[in-house]
């Protein structure tokens, strides 16, 4: 009588660990952060560009249109050029399947501005940056080289200034995962953004207070990618992150004369609310099989946050100004500190 042999069931495949996609998961968040910073730069330039140049500081604000020349041909110093170098250190805390990250960003900005009519100005600016990202809980890192091109326009009426800005960014991402013979990938990223901000200037003597309200929108896309090398290289899906924010706050500034140099110091605070957010997610699958695909939810900042900073400006000559800026951004799961050194010329 034949004896039936028991068959061993095939092993059940398990999904890939979420850690295999962490470094790619941080890319849209980092790109959005870069875009938000550049939009803030353009808003500042829009706010201080319209009207009489002598009444503006690097922190923005407004000016009295009645004090400005009333024809384009009569406007002195119609043109502006500025150059900035900046550095940023930030941290996103671990949450869920994401192991958190640390970011170091270095970049430079160059821009040109023009007063096209009394109370109306336009500007064009380019931002080139490099972001180095390290995942806190895993041996994973990436480098994002991002180019952003932005434009702004400012409208001034009395103490009111309305600034509008838009950006377009594109860049390359190179990621490394693991040690020894790591898994590596190279892919592209794209960025779009827009901002509108309304401010009102109140001044008394050397003091000024500038309340501001506004909103911004940004969208970041990271291309699909395929890793090579390493023990378990993976394919990653395209990622899309999009958010809309509203914000409001105020700047307080003071101007004084030190010997023959005009000095200006201002501080600002701003509350931020993310009213709409879709951070999508990432699906990873093994290049060579052997495991099931895995979906990982996207990375986002907490809804409510506070921005704060300070600006010191020194007028080196009637048409040249040097300024230094500190910017801090604080969320429940995210913190960023940035420093900027800039030089502005007018003619």
Sequence positions of predicted segments:
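Outer membrane beta-barrel translocator domains of Type V secretion systems
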Residues: 5, 9-209, 323-327, 331-347
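Outer-membrane beta-barrel porins/channels
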Residues: 190-197, 210-218, 228, 232, ...
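Short, structured patches in soluble enzyme cores that scaffold and shape functional sites
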Residues: 166-168, 200, 211-221, 269
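Alpha-helical scaffolds that organize eukaryotic protein assemblies
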Residues: 201-204, 228, 254-256
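Short, structured loop/turn "capping" segments at alpha-beta junctions
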Residues: 205-210, 220-224, 258-265
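Outer membrane beta-barrel transmembrane domains
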Residues: 122, 237-347
């Amino acid at each position: 009588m034949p004896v039936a042999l028991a068959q061993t069931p095939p092993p059940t495949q398990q999904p890939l660990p979420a850690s295999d996609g962490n470094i790619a998961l941080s890319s849209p968040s980092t790109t959005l952060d870069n875009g938000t910073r550049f939009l803030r730069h353009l808003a500042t330039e829009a706010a201080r560009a319209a009207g009489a140049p002598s009444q503006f500081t690097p922190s923005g604000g407004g000016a009295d249109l009645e004090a400005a020349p009333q024809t384009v041909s009569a406007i002195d110093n119609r043109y502006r050029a500025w150059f900035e170098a900046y550095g940023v250190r930030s941290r996103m805390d671990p949450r869920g399947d994401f192991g958190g990250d640390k970011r170091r960003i270095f970049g430079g900005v160059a821009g040109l501005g023009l007063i096209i009519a009394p109370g109306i100005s336009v500007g064009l600016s380019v931002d080139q940056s490099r972001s180095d990202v390290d995942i806190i809980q895993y041996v994973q890192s990436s480098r994002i080289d991002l180019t952003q091109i932005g434009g702004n326009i400012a409208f001034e009426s009395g103490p009111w200034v309305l600034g509008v800005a838009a950006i377009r960014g594109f860049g390359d991402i190179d990621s490394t995962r693991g040690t020894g013979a790591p898994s590596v990938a190279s892919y592209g990223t794209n960025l779009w953004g827009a901002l509108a901000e309304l401010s009102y200037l109140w001044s008394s003597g050397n003091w000024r207070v500038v309340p501001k309200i506004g909103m911004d929108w940004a969208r970041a896309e990271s291309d699909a990618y395929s890793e090579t090398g390493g023990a378990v290289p993976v394919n990653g899906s395209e990622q899309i992150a999009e958010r809309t924010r509203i914000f409001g706050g105020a700047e307080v500034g003071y101007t004084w004369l030190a010997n023959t140099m005009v000095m200006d110091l201002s501080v600002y605070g701003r509350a931020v609310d993310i009213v709409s957010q879709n951070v999508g997610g990432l699906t990873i699958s093994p290049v060579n099989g052997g495991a099931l695909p895995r979906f990982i939810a996207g990375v986002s900042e907490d809804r409510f946050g506070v921005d704060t900073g300070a600006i010191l400006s020194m007028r080196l000559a009637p048409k040249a100004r040097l300024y230094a800026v500190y910017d801090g951004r604080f969320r429940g799961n995210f913190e960023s500190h940035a420093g900027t050194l800039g030089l502005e010329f007018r003619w």
